[in-house]
Amino acid sequence: MIRRVLENVATAGVIGAAGDTLMQVREGVTLASQLDTGRTARLVSFRMCHAPVVDAAWRFFDARIPFKGIPGVLARVFADQGFLMPPSITLFFVSQSVMEGCTLGESLFRAKDGFVPAALKCLPFWCTVHCVTFGIVAPRYRMAWASLCAVAWNAIISGENQEAIRRELALRELADANLQGRESEV
């Protein structure tokens, strides 16, 4: 059991680093020295903590969802997206924001702001992936399979986090401009 947890943690961490690096290259980073290693470390930290929880939930679904064949696959996909996706996305945004030095209030705002755009991308992506996860892949290899697919997902969710940061900065600039305008009126 401990070996399985360690394998899942290592797999998710390595592949999380690859996904974030891919996103940074997509965003225009051309030299290794330009990579935001702190950003990558934050994403890897989340993925390494998240993987064992997801694996335990999948084992629970296997034990508790009695359906076989296509109905069983669909039930597990819906369970994954219904029970794991909402807290996973929320915790992703909160954890990234807190590790960036934001307050809990700012972190919760980011989670609220980023949840819907991320969920709208998450559902079609992971529902498709998990039809394979729960329909074809042996339970022992599910985390490796999902982690490989997560290369693309990590790039997407990392990009969503960067968009949320940009929206936060724009709101702060607007608030500062409004405050300065009010001060000049006094």
Language-model features, listed with the residues they occupy:
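Transit-peptide-like, low-complexity N-terminal presequences
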Residues: 1, 166-186
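Alpha-helical transmembrane segments of eukaryotic organelle membrane transporters
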Residues: 2-29, 34-102, 111-166
